[in-house]
């Protein structure tokens, strides 16, 4: 997307802020028009490359929740995560210009001007029960489900499936399954997971590198020796958005 179109999307979203702020029902949940949701999710990729303190990023986060979001900071030598548990979002920032990170840095110790957003993780958390809590990593159970659906994935226009056609976008819902992703995006460029007994294996995952999308799947259908046969019915658990490879 060129700069003028990117600016237009950001402007439209900013103009809609007052509607988002006032669209609260009696239960305290956000009620957002479909067009606004599409603009919001389509703008996710435009956030890549921004600094943690950028106004555009702050604006986007304010649209996702009526409450001010304070992230949990997890820093490592090569990256730092800003985890927004209550809105099902995690942002991975990478250092640039020779900036050196260390493990365990606090927010005030970071040089935000030397960090750029490299990847966006979006979480979809199924209803929790005892068996789910026992079999799911504590880091994942801390997240709530991303609040705005459909999540619109804009697909590369340079790609074609075996029939020579491809939709320009995929509207992802909370129950979108493996077969839905493959039907829209075609066979993945990379995939893995699912090996071993279901109790000890990781879920299957697929990556469409040229679209800048990776999808991890959850549930019993995504694990075990039969995972790739049953995976078509597995619902997504985490979607990662990153810069497409060419």
Which residues does each predicted region cover?
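A cross-family detector of function-defining hotspots
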Residues: 2-246
């Amino acid at each position: 997307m060129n700069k003028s179109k990117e600016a237009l999307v950001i402007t439209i979203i900013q103009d809609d802020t007052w509607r988002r702020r006032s669209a609260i029902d009696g239960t305290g949940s956000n009620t957002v028009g479909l067009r606004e949701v599409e603009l919001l999710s389509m703008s996710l990729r435009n956030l890549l490359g921004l600094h943690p303190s950028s106004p555009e990023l702050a604006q986007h986060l304010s649209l996702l929740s009526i409450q001010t979001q304070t992230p949990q900071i997890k820093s490592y030598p090569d990256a730092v995560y800003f985890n927004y548990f209550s809105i099902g979002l995690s942002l991975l920032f990478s250092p640039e210009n020779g900036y050196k990170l260390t493990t365990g840095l606090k927010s005030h110790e970071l040089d935000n001007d030397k960090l750029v957003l490299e990847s966006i993780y979006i979480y979809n958390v199924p209803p929790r029960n005892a068996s789910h809590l026992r079999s799911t990593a504590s880091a994942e159970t801390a997240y709530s489900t991303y609040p705005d659906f459909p999540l619109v994935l804009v697909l590369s226009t340079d790609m074609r499936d075996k029939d020579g056609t491809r939709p320009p976008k995929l509207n992802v819902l909370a129950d979108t399954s493996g077969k839905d992703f493959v039907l829209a995006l075609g066979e993945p460029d990379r995939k893995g997971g699912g090996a071993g007994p279901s109790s000890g294996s990781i879920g299957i995952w697929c990556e469409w590198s040229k679209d800048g999308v990776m999808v991890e799947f959850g549930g019993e259908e995504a694990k075990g020796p039969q995972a790739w046969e049953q995976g078509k019915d597995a619902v997504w658990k985490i979607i990662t958005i990153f810069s497409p490879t060419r």
